[in-house]
Swiss-Prot record:
Cofactor note: Binds 1 Mg(2+) ion per subunit.
UniProt KW Magnesium keyword: yes
Subunit composition and interactions: Homodimer.
Entry protein name: 1-deoxy-D-xylulose-5-phosphate synthase
Entry's family note: Belongs to the transketolase family. DXPS subfamily.
The protein's role, per its UniProt record: Catalyzes the acyloin condensation reaction between C atoms 2 and 3 of pyruvate and glyceraldehyde 3-phosphate to yield 1-deoxy-D-xylulose-5-phosphate (DXP).
Length: 637
């Protein structure tokens, strides 16, 4: 195990008030020690490393200049908030990041008063900050509100909606644009820093105020000319930008790693007290840790790693990852059908579409962090006869639900939805749990909804989706590796709305939707050993249901347990409605639905989360024993 780094100055800082007591000349050393602490902590827990390394100086500067927590500091997404956590009373728990019972990997209101708004999905910070600023103004307050948002998150429409609103309200709001990709504009050394200080200072602010006063004196007719003059002066100093057109006073770009540049600008903006203001800072993802600087994409999210070498620990896999199976299966189908195209919303590697893009670059579309646009873009492709696969994580598909309903389902457009990260996702916790997609998709008329029980089934579902042209179709699969089944070279086209029986029995029926099938098979062995002959079936489809299969299971078994990795209102609800309509609940059948708990579940290892939810083999056995009033056995299980 690596030795804990030597951090004498950081040891004096428990909360930001301690930081503000330091001399400004000490801050570079503090930043250096904070970076060492961050690398060491994440090396032991895994997590998001690169983004945090990129904002160390910015984090120090913000807490030094602003009076947090009275001044509200909002981090968009939250990947970059680990240094913030270390400086806000959570250093003693930083090595519990993303562990059961430990700190969240994102900002979280319940965790600290220094986290005024929870995050994990992108592009929400400006909207939340504007709401806080409006509330402050209604209450007569004077505190500052600062939203820190990355250039990637600025690709989402919500950020611009919020900025447009902030400009219209002339709200006193500070937005820090953290450009860690140099995708907008690089700073140009000392001149850039000088211009940023000039633009943020009182002299230029005085010019703005003079213009406003002159407008009020001369009347509205002079407003346009004066506004143009002031904007011309601003453009001469800072360069005209889209942000100015939205009503923001734009400062920068400035070097986000130079505290001598950051602190004067932040102080000027704080003291001027008018807004909205956007400060454009340029940072380097992975700054200060050579392996992360050299491969920012590989060190965005990491497993545990060796600090000296940067080598990440990875357990050997006995089966391929579901994401890779999806990608390889889609590539296989795309070789046969040049109408297949792939769409991702800024998650090419997470969804496996980076592999597809290597083979079919012209048929791969990364639309940025813009799930709403991604879905309607895919719908447009479908209208022209193409076969779009819009690969979106379950949790992120929630962001585009209106587009799924209005632009895809109502028009019966054949958009394919590969839904990765279905079910519990472990360390990323409640914000990334794939709980709701079956519930919100299977309720839509004409929508086909499937779930893969294993990696071979996933391959079949990719081909089934490619072959289906009568409307929208979705198939869900979890994070992680498959179960090690034999893999066909190419998938088969599944019969629509038909499941399969994988084990025959007579007393108990376990009907699985998704990858809990393996736990059902283990449970069936235990139940069989207890004298309870058990059938195990894989539903494959939540919509359309295999009504013949369900009818057969209901009529020939005493207990029917449905098992799924989704929330209430999903597969089991459709099964129960069918059973009720058919009168199959009136003959003594004991039905027990097993679903994800009706809570937002905190982070832990997925296997522990499923066990706690009663969705492992032991939980299934307990459910059956309880249904049969085997109280003693239920207690022993």
């Amino acid at each position: 195990m690596n030795a804990t780094p030597h951090t004498p100055l950081l040891d004096k800082v428990r909360i930001p008030a301690d930081l503000r007591a330091l001399d400004e000349s000490e801050l570079p050393q503090l930043a250096s020690e904070l970076r060492l602490e961050l690398v060491d902590a994440v090396s032991r827990t895994g997590g998001h490393l690169g983004a945090g390394l990129g904002v160390v100086e910015l984090t120090v500067a913000l807490h030094y200049v602003f009076n947090t927590p009275d001044d509200r500091l909002i981090w968009d997404v939250g990947h970059q908030a680990y240094p913030h956590k270390i400086l806000t009373g959570r250093r003693d728990r930083i090595r519990t990041l993303r562990q059961e019972g430990g700190l969240s990997g994102f900002t979280r209101r319940a965790e600290s008063e220094y986290d005024p708004f929870g995050a994990a999905h992108s592009s929400t910070s400006i909207s939340a900050g504007l709401g806080m600023a409006a509330a402050r103004d209604l209450s007569g307050g004077r505190n500052n509100v600062i939203a820190v948002i990355g250039d990637g998150a600025m690709s989402a429409g919500m950020a611009y909606e919020a900025m447009n609103n902030a400009g219209a309200l002339d709200a006193r709001l500070i937005v820090i644009l953290n450009d860690n990709d140099m995708s907008i504009a690089p700073p140009t050394g000392a001149m850039s820093a000088y211009l940023a200080r000039l633009a943020s200072g009182k002299a230029y602010a005085g010019l703005r105020d003079f213009g406003k006063k002159l407008t009020s004196y001369l009347g509205k007719r002079a407003d346009r000319a004066i506004t143009r003059a002031v904007e011309h002066a601003r453009g001469y100093v800072t360069g005209g930008t889209l942000f100015e057109e939205l009503g923001f006073y734009h400062i920068g770009p400035i070097d986000g790693h130079n505290l001598e540049h950051l602190i004067p600008v932040l102080k000027n903006v704080r003291d001027n007290g008018e807004g909205p203001v956007l400060i454009h800072v340029v940072t380097q993802k992975g700054k200060g840790y050579a392996p992360a600087e050299a491969a920012a994409d590989k060190y965005h999210g990491v497993n545990k790693f060796d600090v000296i070498t940067g080598a990440q620990a990875k357990a050997p896999a006995n089966a391929p990852a579901y994401t890779k199976v999806f990608a390889e299966s889609l590539i296989r189908e795309a070789r046969e059908d040049d109408r297949i195209v792939a769409v991702t919303a800024a998650m090419p590697s997470g969804t496996g579409l980076d592999l597809f893009g290597e083979v079919f670059p012209s048929r791969t579309f990364d639309v940025g962090i813009a799930e709403q646009h991604a879905v309607t873009f895919a719908a447009g492709l479908a209208t022209e006869g193409y076969k779009p696969f819009a690969a979106i994580y379950s949790t992120f598909l929630q962001r585009a639900y209106d587009q799924v309903v209005h632009d895809v389902a109502i028009q019966k457009l054949p958009v394919r939805f590969p839904i990765d990260r279905a079910g519990f996702v472990g360390a990323d916790g409640a914000t990334h749990c794939g709980a709701f997609d079956t519930t919100f998709l299977a309720s839509l008329p004409g929508f086909v909804v499937m779930a893969a029980a294993d990696e071979a089934e996933l391959r079949h579902m990719v081909r089934t989706a490619a072959a289906y042209d009568d409307g929208p179709i979705a198939f869900r699969y979890p994070r992680g590796n498959g179960v090690g089944v034999d893999m066909p070279e190419r998938g088969e086209v599944l019969e629509l709305g038909k499941g399969r029986v994988v084990r025959e029995g007579s007393k108990v029926a376990l009907l699985s939707f998704g990858t809990r099938l393996q736990d059902c098979l283990i449970a069936a062995e235990e139940l069989g050993a207890a004298g309870l002959s058990t059938t195990v079936a894989d539903a494959r489809f939540a919509k359309p249901l295999d009504e013949d299969l369900i009818r057969r299971l209901a009529r020939s078994h005493e207990v029917l347990v449905t098992v799924e990795e989704g929330a209430i209102g999903g597969f089991a609800s459709h099964v129960l409605q069918f059973l009720a309509h058919e009168g199959l609940l009136e003959s003594g059948l004991k039905v027990r639905p097993l679903v994800l708990p009706d809570v937002f579940t905190d982070h832990a290892k997925p296997e522990k989360m499923y066990a706690d939810a009663g969705l492992d083999a032991a939980g299934i056995v307990r459910t059956v024993f309880t249904a049969l009033d085997h109280t003693a056995r239920a207690q022993r299980a």
